[in-house]
Design a protein with these regions (language model features):
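Elongated, amphipathic alpha-helical interaction scaffolds
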Residues: 1-284
């Protein structure tokens, strides 16, 4: 199974340009910035020394640092993941002045904001907040990180889409694809038909005309991987439940993991397992 973490998604490629990110910024914060040159993309791409990779991050005038993640399966652990990302971004930001961190001079930092754009099948919510404190074993307000989750499903956050063309167009693209899949088209058929539909209706037109083969590859892989992962998880759970024990359920998932049919990252991303269950699954 290919590793989605080392591949970009259509969302990241399309949304992650300076001009589109400026539109997202203005729509979310209700501002009116017009100069895309003020946007500095800071996305963590991973390297030989660090495998930390996020979807999109950028700064505007070095005042605001916005971190954006795209998900088709909502992950309740996003606050702690984003905490790791912003930690790495701050380390890189202060690198030129790192000696000052031990001085009496205060190092000024861009204010971070955290967003997830959800693109899955759950239409029960429009906007929700995920809080780092929800994961604490005992109540505490000493450290907090709030992630704002926006649902891109049809009929959700239409006011936001109305004022943000990139999000509106991506939502049309994605939701049309999902509609075709529900009608029985294969992944490849649905991707190709969606591209044609969007080009004909001037949706993501320029991007799709210049990147059609890449989009077919990326979007097809993204949704194939998602559907395969969910099917494997459901199959593993069914095997465990048939035994009538939670132990059997976890052992079945562990078998899938050891056989290379699912990854620990995929299990974490599914949001179906507690940290304790993941630790039990990971045991050899």
């Amino acid at each position: 199974m290919a590793n989605l973490q080392v591949r970009d998604t259509v969302f990241c490629r399309f949304i992650g340009t300076e001009s589109n990110l400026l539109e997202v910024f203005n729509a979310i914060r209700k501002t009116g910035y017009t100069d895309a040159s003020k946007v500095m993309i800071t996305t963590l791409a991973g390297s030989f020394y660090s495998n930390i990779k996020n979807d999109i991050s950028f700064m505007l005038d070095a005042l605001i640092m916005m971190l954006i993640e795209h998900q088709t399966t909502l992950n309740p652990n996003m606050p702690v993941r984003l905490l790791g990302y912003v930690d790495e971004l701050f380390k890189r930001y202060i690198e030129p002045e790192k000696r000052k961190i031990y001085s009496t001079e205060l190092i000024k930092l861009p204010a971070p904001e955290f967003y997830v754009f959800y693109d899955g099948e759950d239409t029960s919510f429009e906007h929700k907040e995920l809080r780092l404190s929800d994961a604490f074993k005992t109540p505490s307000d000493k450290l907090e990180l709030v992630v704002h989750v926006y649902n891109l499903a049809t009929g959700k956050n239409e006011d936001l889409k109305k004022i943000c063309k990139p999000l509106r167009e991506y939502s049309i693209f994605s939701n049309h694809y999902k509609l075709l899949r529900k009608q029985g088209l294969t992944v490849d058929e649905a991707v190709r038909d969606t591209i044609r539909y969007c080009i004909d209706n001037d949706v993501m037109k320029n991007y799709l005309l210049h990147n059609e083969s890449e989009v077919i590859d990326m979007f097809g892989f993204e949704w194939n991987e998602k559907e395969e992962r969910e099917a494997l998880l459901e199959a593993g759970e069914a095997r465990g439940i048939a035994i009538g024990e939670t132990r059997g359920r976890l052992n079945s998932i562990r078998d899938l993991l050891s056989d290379g049919l699912v990854t620990l990252d995929a299990l974490k991303a599914s949001g179906r397992y507690s940290p304790e269950e993941l630790a039990a699954i990971a045991k050899s």
